Amino acid sequence: MTGSLQSAARSYLRGLGDESTVVLCGGTALLIVSRYQGSADFFRAVFSPKLAGHPAIDALPYFWWFGTSVIFYVVLSLALSAATRGSFTRSYGLRLGDFRAGAAIAAALLVATAAAIYIASRTHTFSNHYPLARHGAYTLRFGDKQAVSRGLFALYEAGYFLYFLAWEFLFRGWMLNGLLPRFGRGAIAIQMVPFALMHLGKPELEALGSIIAGIALGILALRTRSFWYGAFLHGALAVFMDLLVAWRYLFPHVPSP
């Protein structure tokens, strides 16, 4: 009985031993570990007590999150492919691909989506959620005093943009291209699932919209053979949302756009 079960298990496992299995299992593990050790909450629990007097103490957990995301989503994903002799020697969408089509499509989507971002930024649901660091994204603390810092905000948004480059590489670069040989265009739908689930906790409309966004960004990456255009689009829209919400604090004497 035990022998037959072992034989059946080996038979099933042999069919799972390709790169798509490494991408699905490894990608899931990377997302889980990053959610714990790479989160802002982890930084607050481990490091914040030791850095309590730092002027940017409210922003530091997010710099940790953005930085560790690059390690988990880019460095470790490629290391995993290398260790398992996957297709790490391929581009994984790292090349520019079809630049003309990518730039045109990304620009059109940027203009079309920016209007929705603008409207959303005027609602309490989104203005109370972004920036993710809230006032910490642009506020320095000096004892009992606080000061708005545009420089801190610029650094925060640069890190935030870098986070989206890593995020897009994981889903539309590494995962999509790793699944493509086995699942064909179905890989677009498969990579959308964990992408959408990672939006749990965000405003409901954004979480639901991530289903459409995940499919659209997957198509864009497949059409252009590059993840860069979706990464720029995703990052630019996220920074735009933060800027709209934080504008009145950063530029109190300048009318809000």
Q: Which residues are covered by each model-predicted region?
A:
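N-terminal, membrane-interfacial amphipathic/helix-forming hydrophobic leader that caps
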Residues: 1-93, 244-257
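Hydrophobic alpha-helical transmembrane segments
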Residues: 21-25, 63, 67, 102-107, ...
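Aromatic-anchored segments of alpha-helical transmembrane domains
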Residues: 27-37, 51, 111-119, 192-200, ...
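Alpha-helical transmembrane segments of multi-pass integral membrane proteins
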Residues: 30, 64-69, 77, 109, ...
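Juxtamembrane helix-loop-helix connectors linking adjacent transmembrane helices
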Residues: 42-63, 83-163, 181, 251-257
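Membrane-embedded alpha-helical segments of multi-pass membrane proteins
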Residues: 67-75, 154, 158, 170, ...
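Membrane-interface helix/loop boundary segments of multi-pass membrane proteins
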Residues: 166-190, 219-226
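Functionally important transmembrane alpha-helices
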Residues: 189-192, 198, 204-257
